[in-house]
Curated annotation (Swiss-Prot):
GO terms for molecular function: ATP binding; ATP hydrolysis activity; ATP-dependent protein folding chaperone; unfolded protein binding. This is Chaperone protein HscA homolog. Belongs to the heat shock protein 70 family. It comes from Cupriavidus taiwanensis (strain DSM 17343 / BCRC 17206 / CCUG 44338 / CIP 107171 / LMG 19424 / R1) (Ralstonia taiwanensis (strain LMG 19424)). The gene is hscA. It comes from the Bacteria. One of its GO terms (biological process) is iron-sulfur cluster assembly.
């Protein structure tokens, strides 16, 4: 006789059965997968004990693919079909790809995202990333002995909506359920903060293969709050390799190189950089296709000299993030280093000098992000023990707003707001009988729409015709935990609604974000004057238009002289509104407003008499 197992809906019939979830660090150079086993997070290795999976995919003519070390081993021989650092291309168009002239790939400028021509056909960064994620999923299932319920995948804090969506798409293509996208610095904070029960202000300095992130965190009991973020999505260890490659070419006086020679020297450059983490000098040897021999000695002094500008380039966003957080370097309790590139002695020295303390390095910088992601995945899968609930508060990098009359920007969600977040604001119509409203979604810190980045446009139609100012349109901005923005506009009387989900076809580079912030600081005074001028002009237009309508409907309440006086005031407002003096416009508007007070009172009396006509006193009681 078989026994039927009965359990609560949605619950496992085995009360102690764990739901298997993993954390994945989808890196530019290397990727990792980690899981919590026996309450301890650990990185899962392959059958040969290797934790790191090179983020390299090679496509073959038979349409199969090699992933990881096998692909990396063939990179020199088959550079065009061996894709490295694909993370740099996620959500990017062809014009956004940095150092494209040094790349051996045949790019295809496809709509929305660049693609790469390979022996197995044209491949998108989403498809290539999916190969890496599928390999990590298989490794995890082999190690854990069961299927996964999902994964937490980490992304740089500065990934925009298009890049985050591309990451989600890659995961789904790899057969992974995305429990959450988690910012890499936040993942590091989970690993360090909980292991060490840390509280206070911390900085997470994350220099990976292709991206740099700096986050200022406030760690208190149960709450991880990101006070500010910054960084550069086109700066990482690869750039140090690239600079060293240029030095090799210069020192060896090499002629234009083939793609295979270029890849060979890049491999040698990366090996030399890594060797200097343990030694004061190293030798670079290579034999090119032409038979030419490269033999150079690289010292740590030379390496520091030729890469000093890259080190300094990382410190500019650090200063900016500290200013945004309202703290000084001396207030930072500790500095967490993340990413394999932070093993470079020049980086550790520069960070230590800047903050006046030795950075924390007790966790492997290559693994710390994956470990934190695994802890978060374990929590989301429902495996946490009592007291293991954490609140993760990430932030958005730039303010989100909407264009209003006069080309102004009304900020709905200010930058550095914690996410997920939803904010709403009510707007109204400008003209009588207006039945539609254009919604222009903007990103940036400037006061004028023309100076901000346009994210999306849509229209709300079907607004009931009313007098200007009577309709109420509620505009709601919602940013989810993955940083994706949705905007909804709803007319409150009729319930008509329109919405848009913002997935920009091209990503926003971090130097663009830095430039936008710098412009907002530099142009703050000018912007405020421009805003004041635009606001006064809008008010002038509104009052003149309202007065003109009143004259058309109730002009008989005025004598000829009174009407002439009002029209003269209107003409003065129109003329002054074309000028640049917002105070003069305000004064003219006030004169028109005061000059029509008596007219407004007479119109009110007429309206009241009209409303009461034929009514009995008892009806009014």
């Amino acid at each position: 006789m078989a026994l039927l197992q009965i359990s609560e809906p949605g619950m496992s019939p085995a009360p102690h059965q764990r739901r298997l979830a993993v954390g994945i660090d989808l890196g530019t150079t290397n990727s990792l997968v980690a899981a919590v086993r026996s309450s301890i997070p650990e990185v899962l290795a392959d059958e040969r004990g290797r934790a790191l999976l090179p983020s390299v995919v090679r496509y073959l003519p038979d349409r199969t693919a090699q992933i990881g070390y096998r692909a990396q081993d063939e990179a020199v021989r088959d550079p065009k079909n061996t894709i490295v650092s694909v993370k740099r291309f996620m959500g990017r168009g062809l014009r956004d790809v940095a150092n494209i002239e040094h790349s051996p790939y045949d790019f295809v400028d496809a709509p929305g995202m660049v693609q790469i021509k390979t022996a197995a056909g044209v491949k998108s960064p989403v498809e290539i990333s999916a190969e890496i994620l599928a390999t990590l999923r298989q490794r995890a299932e082999d190690s854990l002995g069961d299927d996964l319920v999902g994964a937490v995948i980490t992304v740089p804090a500065y990934f925009d909506e298009a890049q985050r969506q591309a990451t989600k798409d890659a995961a789904r293509l790899a057969g992974l359920e995305v429990l959450r996208l988690l910012n890499e610095p936040t993942a590091a904070a989970i690993a360090y903060g909980l292991d060490n029960a840390a509280e206070g202000i911390y900085a997470v300095y994350d220099l990976g293969g292709g991206t740099f992130d700096i986050s200022v965190l406030k760690l208190t009991q149960g709450v991880f709050e990101v006070l500010a973020t910054g960084g550069d999505s086109a700066l990482g260890g690869d750039d140090f390799d690239q600079r060293l490659l240029c030095w090799i070419v210069e020192q060896a006086n090499l002629q234009p190189l083939s793609a295979q020679d270029m890849r060979l020297l890049m491999v040698r450059a990366r090996a030399a950089k890594e060797a200097l983490s343990e030694a004061d000098s190293t030798v670079i040897d290579a034999v090119l296709e032409s038979g030419e021999i490269v033999h150079l000695t690289l010292t740590d002094e030379i390496f520091e000299q030729i890469t000093a500008h890259l080190v300094q380039k990382t410190l500019a966003p650090v200063r900016k993030a500290l200013r945004d957080a309202g703290v000084g370097p001396e207030e930072v309790k500790g500095v967490v280093l993340v990413g394999g590139a932070t093993r470079m002695p020049s980086i550790r020295k520069a960070v230590g000098d800047f903050f006046g303390q030795n950075p924390l390095t007790n966790l492997d910088p290559d693994r710390v992000v994956a470990l934190g992601a695994a802890m978060q995945a374990n929590l989301l899968a429902g495996n946490h023990a009592p007291g293991e609930d954490w609140l993760l508060l990430d932030v958005i990098p730039l303010s989100l707003g909407v264009e209003t009359m006069g080309g102004l920007v009304e900020k709905i969600i200010p930058r550095n707001s914690t996410i997920p977040v939803a904010r709403a604001q009510e707007f109204t119509t400008f003209k009588d009988g207006q039945t539609a409203m254009a919604i222009h979604v903007l990103q940036g810190e400037r006061e004028l729409a023309s100076d901000c980045r346009s994210l999306a446009r849509f229209e709300l139609r079907g607004i009931p015709p009313m007098v200007a100012g009577a309709a109420r349109i509620r505009v709601t901005y919602q940013v989810d935990a993955d940083g994706l923005l949705s905007v909804t506009a709803r007319e409150t009387h009729s319930g008509v609604e329109a919405s848009v989900t913002v997935k920009p076809s091209y990503g926003l580079a971090d130097d663009d974000i830095a430039r936008m912030l710098q412009d907002s600081f530099r142009e703050a005074e000018h912007d405020m004057k421009s805003r004041a001028l635009a606001e006064e002009r809008v008010e002038a237009d509104r009052l003149v238009e309202a007065t003109q309508r009143a004259l058309e409907t109730d002009g008989d309440l005025l004598s000829a002289d009174e009407r002439a006086a009002v029209e003269a005031l209107m003409a003065t407002v129109r003329e002054i509104a074309t000028g640049e003096d917002h105070l003069a416009i305000r004064a003219a508007v006030e004169k028109l407003s005061h000059g029509t007070d008596e007219f407004a009172a007479r119109r009110m009396d007429r309206s009241i008499k009209s409303a009461l006509a034929g009514r009995k006193v008892q009806e009014l009681g």
